Amino acid sequence: MTVISQVILQADDELRYPSSGELKSIQAFMQTGVKRTRIASTLAENEKKIVQEATKQLWQKRPDFISPGGNAYGERQRSLCIRDFGWYLRLITYGVLAGDKEPIEKIGLIGVREMYNSLGVPVPGMVEAIASLKKAALDLLSAEDAAEASPYFDYIIQAMS
């Protein structure tokens, strides 16, 4: 939940106006809006490049994934894996824009371990995939922007671990 939503809900629960401290936290959040939007735009505009690089890194590190018997063996399985890369990158942009991990949790992480386990997808492999996605994405960002985006990737990695 964004800072703005949190402040409004808290104040409303207590039937009061937001305090000056709460208003300052909203102001600080708003001041980071340009940066958060820039990061999300960069990730969205470079999705194809990021996904291609992450895929390349993952296959180089784990060729067993695309070898016969691997979970990404064959064109269909590989396409599904690449699709998931794009989906997770989109989740990251939602978190960055909101300045909060809640969209990632609500939209993407509830039940993800169970889903992958039921499909026979090794969760440790997904963790490696997200780590590759993180590296490919952060390599396109400035150090400051990478520091802002990194925790959202880490949140997904930790949730899957």
From Swiss-Prot:
Residues involved in (2R,3E)-phycocyanobilin binding: C81
Coiled coil: none
Major place of residence: membrane
Keyword terms of this UniProt record: Antenna complex, Bile pigment, Chromophore, Electron transport, Membrane, Methylation, Photosynthesis, Phycobilisome, Thylakoid, Transport
Domain of life: Bacteria
GO biological process, one term: photosynthesis
Pfam families the record matches: Phycobilisome
Location of this chain's protein in the cell: Cellular thylakoid membrane
Keyword Electron transport: yes
Post-translational modification: Contains one covalently linked bilin chromophore.
Post-translational modification N4-methylasparagine, affected residues: N71
Membrane topology qualifier: Peripheral membrane protein
Cellular component GO terms, alphabetical: phycobilisome; plasma membrane-derived thylakoid membrane
Function, as annotated: Allophycocyanin is a photosynthetic bile pigment-protein complex with maximum absorption at approximately 650 nanometers.
The family this protein is said to belong to: Belongs to the phycobiliprotein family.
Name under which the protein is recorded: Allophycocyanin alpha-B chain
Organism: Microchaete diplosiphon (Fremyella diplosiphon)
Gene name as annotated: apcD
